[in-house]
Curated annotation (Swiss-Prot):
Gene3D superfamilies per UniProt: Survival protein SurE-like phosphatase/nucleotidase
Protein encoded by which gene: surE
EC nos: 3.1.3.5
Name of this chain's protein: 5'-nucleotidase SurE
Organism: Campylobacter jejuni subsp. jejuni serotype O:6 (strain 81116 / NCTC 11828)
Primary location class: cytoplasm
Listed GO MF terms: 3'-nucleotidase activity; 5'-nucleotidase activity; exopolyphosphatase activity; metal ion binding; nucleotide binding
Length: 258
């Protein structure tokens, strides 16, 4: 029997997580363990908690919330504390409410859950559902169908990537999808804002906000294809070295020494 570990960054009560658990329980004869944050941890990136203790709080059969933990905490602790004899065959992070594309991947707690898994040597996928602000309720039907297909492929054929690589998967908002595209991550155009105010005691404070987020116009990027109605799959590697720039930096350093 296969073993699956699930986490997310929207918290243990999120709708995307509930839908995913229901589908996996119905479609796969697998031993499923869920460890999710006790509260929303969106944009927490790959942070882990080093300054205070963490504790599992059981909320169901093999279902735990991690008290004030991040997605990376959830995966790290689950692998070290809950799996004594055999590690999971797959880690799934999601389904996130909102896309994780372009450089957003570096901020994403959802993607960080998958990153932590592959750092520990476990195949992983990150799942995110794109939606429009006008949508009152998210439809996860397509996301669940595609996720089922991908997991079945992984179990039948093995994971398609090397160590320290994961699949970042995004699902379009449209009810009728055009298909699945393997693509690169796009490039964000960022316009951050910091809104200041003063509390009743006269102390200034700030709310961070990301306003008017947009992307560079690239035909085959994840965001462009997602907007056109395609589900996107982007292989992500944790090796951040810009190999093609190494000679340039050596030349630059040598020139500075002259």
């Amino acid at each position: 029997m296969k073993e699956i570990l699930i986490t997310n960054d929207d918290g243990y009560e999120s709708e995307g997580l509930k839908k995913l658990i229901k589908m996996l329980t119905k479609e796969f004869k697998a031993k499923i363990t869920i460890v999710a944050p006790a509260s929303e941890k969106s944009a927490c990136s790959h942070s882990i908690t080093l300054t205070k203790p963490l504790r599992f709080v059981k909320v169901g059969k093999r279902f735990y919330k991690l008290d004030d933990g991040t997605p990376a905490d959830c995966v790290y602790l689950a692998l070290h504390a809950l799996y004594k004899k055999r590690l999971p065959d797959l880690v799934i992070s999601g389904i996130n409410k909102g896309a994780n594309v372009g450089e957003d991947i570096t901020y994403s707690g959802t993607c960080a859950g998958a990153m932590e898994a592959v750092l520990q040597g476990i195949p992983a996928i990150a799942l995110s559902q794109f939606y429009k602000k006008s949508e009152k309720e998210l439809d996860y039907k397509n996301a669940l169908q595609i996720t089922k297909k991908i997991i079945q492929n992984i179990f039948d054929k093995g994971f398609p990537l090397e160590k320290k690589e994961f699949l970042n998967i995004n699902f379009p908002a449209k009810s009728k999808i055009k298909g699945i595209k393997i693509c690169k991550a796009g490039k964000r155009v960022y316009n951050f804002e910091a809104h200041s105010n003063v509390n009743p005691r006269g102390v200034e404070y700030y709310w961070l906000a990301a306003a008017n987020l947009d992307f560079e116009d690239e035909k085959n990027s994840d965001i462009a294809l997602l907007k056109k109605g395609y589900a996107t799959i982007t292989p992500i590697m944790l090796d951040l070295t810009a190999y093609e720039k190494m000679k340039k930096v050596k030349k630059w350093l040598k020139a500075n020494d002259e």
